[in-house]
Amino acid sequence: MIKANVEVSGKLWHKKIKSPKKYFYKKLKKISKFFPLLKGKNLTFTILLTNSLNIKKLNKKFRNRNKPTDVLSFPEFSPNSFKLIKKKNIYIGDIATCYEIINIRSNKNNFLLEFDKAWVHGLLHLVGYNHIKNRDYFKMNKIEEKILNLITK
C-alpha cells in the first residue's frame, strides 16, 4: 500500500482539488498494486502542494536552479538501494508540486491531468526510477503512461 501525507501551501490548490487528501487516497489505492517490488510493503511519502515562489526556493537550494519547476522529488533512498530494503514500513521521501507551472502547462483546460503527470513522475523517482540515460527515460515514461491510464479512468 502507498499512502501520502498531503501538505497544502496556498489557497489556489483548493480551487482545483477540493479535498487533496481524498484525491490522493483514491489515486494511490488504484496504483498500490501496480509495483510488484512493493508487494507486502507499506510506503509513505509527503507531497507539498505549493506555489512558484516556494518551489523556486527549493529548486535553488537543492538543485542550484533559480527558477520554478512543476515537480521536485527528494528520495529517501538511492535508486539501487531501494530494491534492497527489507523493512515492511518505508518512508520513501518527499515531493513538491507547483500550482502555477502546472496551471500554465494545462492551458487551464485539464489541470488535474497535468497535476497527475507531475506527482506520478515524482513518485517514480521516490521508488527508484530515473531518466539520466535515454533507455531509463523511455522505461520511466512507459510506466508513467501506464499509471496515468490507470488513475485517470
Which residue ranges define each predicted feature?
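An acidic/histidine-cluster motif and surrounding catalytic segment
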Residues: 1-118, 124-153
